[in-house]
Amino acid sequence: MQHAPLNFVPDAAKVPPTPGQSPNARWSREAIEALFALPFNDLLFQAQQVHRAHFDANAVQLSTLLSIKTGGCPEDCSYCPQSARYDTGVEAEKLMPIDTVLEAAARAKQNGASRFCMGAAWRNPKPHQLDAVADMVRGVKAMGLETCVTLGMLKQEQAQQLKDAGLDYYNHNLDTAPEFYGEIITTRTYQDRLDTLEHVRDAGINVCCGGIVGLGESRHERAGLVAELANMEPYPDSVPINNLVKVEGTPLAGNEALDPFEFVRTIAVARITMPKAMVRLSAGREAMDDALQALCFMAGANSIFYGEKLLTTDNPEADADRKLLARLGMRVEVQDHLHQAEGAQHSHSSHCHIDITPAD
């Protein structure tokens, strides 16, 4: 009986070379839909090949996300429990004191995180609010952690203020495809989001931009989201992929759950189309069993949010995360800012690994 060689790729898995490797090439939505349509094993095989070409396939970055200002947001994002328009049980809170934030960052670092993200439920920050966040960024940076904030829309001078404070990444997601966006949000336009991303990039801050699946979108629209991200010039350094967390009181609380394999496909397609980006397994991970998370790592996810609340939704317990990664033989990547905006786009600086030992 003959066996195919280890490097055998079936015809169904063969697609054109990755356009993302050419500065002037663009991904058509049709090409992205063709990736989604591949047999599952072929898609994961291709995604894993791309992943190994650019990253250590057994390394994962641990990120911690802290909600520094929770609730009371005036926007109407239909998935979000922090909107003041919905009765979700989330109470509006004031901006956290800087000492509280820095204590949380220190705990995150002690628990193995190398990236600390701060999120505030604002449409856009006011000057005094941004001053406070800039101080937080300086304090977290001084601990040797990679910094990211998500604060809503920014003007150019606000982005520059954050850059001057030493911010590494600014997160501002597109959420979904342009044609489906109006079904989810009406208080902020797609162009508003693109404008903020332009200001962030012009300031020299690394872009963190992804989306949410399971909003009720079609596969065609999921492909549209990936196309928007992959065709940015350049594509984002950091791409969080969120699976809708259905929260009682929000308009999407009754949505039908996305097929778990479709979520894995989305991770794989993001990896193939944005080969050098950090693909972050974000909201919704708490509902995934260990096998599904392992498939996401196989598909090219190389960062997880770890150990704290993911804004206002539960994230898996830190010890469970440690045990899972240890069972998979994965290592924690300790990074000295993977992507520096001052250097070459998507270049990687030195990094080392630490083994994960689960707590007793």
Curated annotation (Swiss-Prot):
Cofactor note: Binds 1 [4Fe-4S] cluster. The cluster is coordinated with 3 cysteines and an exchangeable S-adenosyl-L-methionine. Binds 1 [2Fe-2S] cluster. The cluster is coordinated with 3 cysteines and 1 arginine.
GO BP term, example: biotin biosynthetic process
Residues binding [2Fe-2S] cluster, per UniProt: C117, C148, C208, R280
Assigned keywords, A-Z: 2Fe-2S, 4Fe-4S, Biotin biosynthesis, Iron, Iron-sulfur, Metal-binding, S-adenosyl-L-methionine, Transferase
Pathway(s) annotated for this protein in UniProt: Cofactor biosynthesis; biotin biosynthesis; biotin from 7,8-diaminononanoate: step 2/2
Domain of life of the source: Bacteria
Enzyme class: transferase
Nucleotide-binding among keywords: no
Catalytic activity, reaction form: (4R,5S)-dethiobiotin + (sulfur carrier)-SH + 2 reduced [2Fe-2S]-[ferredoxin] + 2 S-adenosyl-L-methionine = (sulfur carrier)-H + biotin + 2 5'-deoxyadenosine + 2 L-methionine + 2 oxidized [2Fe-2S]-[ferredoxin]
Gene3D superfamilies cross-referenced by the UniProt entry: Aldolase class I
Molecular-function GO term, any one: 2 iron, 2 sulfur cluster binding
Cofactor requirements of the protein: [4Fe-4S] cluster; [2Fe-2S] cluster
Residue span of region Disordered: 1-25, 340-360
UniProt EC number: 2.8.1.6
Annotated family: Belongs to the radical SAM superfamily. Biotin synthase family.
Function comment: Catalyzes the conversion of dethiobiotin (DTB) to biotin by the insertion of a sulfur atom into dethiobiotin via a radical-based mechanism.
NCBIfam families found in the cross-reference section: bioB
Quaternary structure, from the entry: Homodimer.
Name by which UniProt lists this protein: Biotin synthase
Gene: bioB
